[in-house]
């Protein structure tokens, strides 16, 4: 049976290699931790239908390789993305220091209006932390990002990260800030929304005419 949904959003998962991007995606799609995860080569893909704010939304999620040698390949997948998880490892300052470059890529190659949530992953390794919550919060605030610390291992805040991003996109559609019909918006109407959009015209076409007698 074909899936029905109100909207389809294209999402990216971006950040340096070894931050747990593939594990976050796997936890969100399969609701379990991905054992023996290797570095992504190129891109990986997953999708899931979720309910957000009374709407049914299909998330198409592209997990991009973090290694520099794959950047030219993965950048082509940025186009037309509506949302992104920008991931660093709380136990690796090096991955945190590279966030600005990843964010620049997202806003340049996808869209200046892309909705981004910063994810400090591997929260379960808090004793090995190199990046404080306060420091990352400040970076998020300065760059107008949402922010959560996540654990792909335990699942903590993984679902919330994706849903929070989707909820923000829906709010921007409702406010008129984002237009699903604009080319490259990363948003498509699903069957449900298309039927609702067409309904007024159909109803208008068959509306009874007033009697002239």
UniProtKB/Swiss-Prot annotation:
Chain positions found as Cysteine methyl ester: 213
CDD domains per UniProt: Rab4
Subunit structure: Interacts (GTP-bound form) with RUFY1; the interaction allows endosomal tethering and fusion.
Identification of the protein by name: Ras-related protein Rab-4B
Short sequence motif named Switch 1, residue ranges: 39-44
Catalytic function, reaction form: GTP + H2O = GDP + phosphate + H(+)
Binding positions for GTP per the UniProt entry: 18-23, 37, 39-40, 66, 121-122, 124, 152-153
UniProt xrefs under InterPro entries: P-loop_NTPase, Rab4, Rab_GTPases_membrane_traffic, Small_GTP-bd, Small_GTPase
Family recorded in the similarity comment: Belongs to the small GTPase superfamily. Rab family.
EC number: 3.6.5.2
Domain of life: Eukaryota
Gene Ontology molecular function, alphabetical: G protein activity; GTP binding; GTPase activity
Annotated source species: Rattus norvegicus (Rat)
Modification note: Serotonylation of Gln-67 by TGM2 during activation and aggregation of platelets leads to constitutive activation of GTPase activity.
Class of enzymatic activity (EC top level): hydrolase
Modification N-acetylalanine, positions: 2
Gene this chain is encoded by: Rab4b
Cross-referenced PROSITE patterns: RAB
Activity regulation behaviour: Regulated by guanine nucleotide exchange factors (GEFs) which promote the exchange of bound GDP for free GTP. Regulated by GTPase activating proteins (GAPs) which increase the GTP hydrolysis activity. Inhibited by GDP dissociation inhibitors (GDIs).
Its job: The small GTPases Rab are key regulators of intracellular membrane trafficking, from the formation of transport vesicles to their fusion with membranes. Rabs cycle between an inactive GDP-bound form and an active GTP-bound form that is able to recruit to membranes different set of downstream effectors directly responsible for vesicle formation, movement, tethering and fusion. RAB4B mediates endosomal tethering and fusion through the interaction with RUFY1 and RAB14. Acts as a regulator of platelet alpha-granule release during activation and aggregation of platelets.
Domain comment, as recorded: Switch 1, switch 2 and the interswitch regions are characteristic of Rab GTPases and mediate the interactions with Rab downstream effectors. The switch regions undergo conformational changes upon nucleotide binding which drives interaction with specific sets of effector proteins, with most effectors only binding to GTP-bound Rab.
Residues with Phosphoserine modification: 185, 193
Subcellular location: Cell membrane; Early endosome membrane
Positions that bind Mg(2+): 22, 40, 63
Topological category with respect to the lipid bilayer: Lipid-anchor
Motif (Switch 2): 65-74
The UniProt record lists the keyword Nucleotide-binding: yes
Chain positions found as 5-glutamyl serotonin: 67
């Amino acid at each position: 049976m074909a899936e029905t949904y109100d909207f389809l959003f294209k999402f990216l998962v971006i950040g340096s290699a070894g931050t747990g991007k593939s594990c976050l995606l796997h936890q969100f799609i399969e609701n379990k931790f991905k054992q023996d995860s290797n570095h992504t080569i190129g891109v990986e893909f997953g999708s899931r239908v979720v309910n957000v704010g009374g709407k049914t939304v299909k998330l198409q999620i592209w997990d991009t390789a973090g290694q520099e040698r794959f950047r030219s390949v993965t950048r082509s997948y940025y186009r037309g993305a509506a949302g992104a998880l920008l991931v660093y490892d709380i136990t690796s300052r090096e991955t945190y220091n590279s966030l600005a470059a990843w964010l620049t890529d997202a806003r340049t190659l996808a869209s200046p209006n892309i909705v981004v949530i910063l994810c400090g992953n591997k929260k379960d390794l808090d004793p090995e932390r190199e990046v404080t919550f306060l420091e990352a919060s400040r970076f998020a605030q300065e760059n107008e990002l949402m922010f959560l610390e996540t654990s792909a291992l335990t699942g903590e805040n993984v679902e919330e990260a994706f849903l929070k991003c989707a909820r923000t996109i829906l709010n921007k559609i409702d406010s008129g800030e984002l237009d699903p019909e604009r080319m490259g918006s990363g948003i498509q109407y699903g069957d449900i929304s298309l039927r609702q959009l067409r309904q007024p015209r159909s109803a208008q076409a068959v509306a009874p005419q007033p009697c002239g007698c």
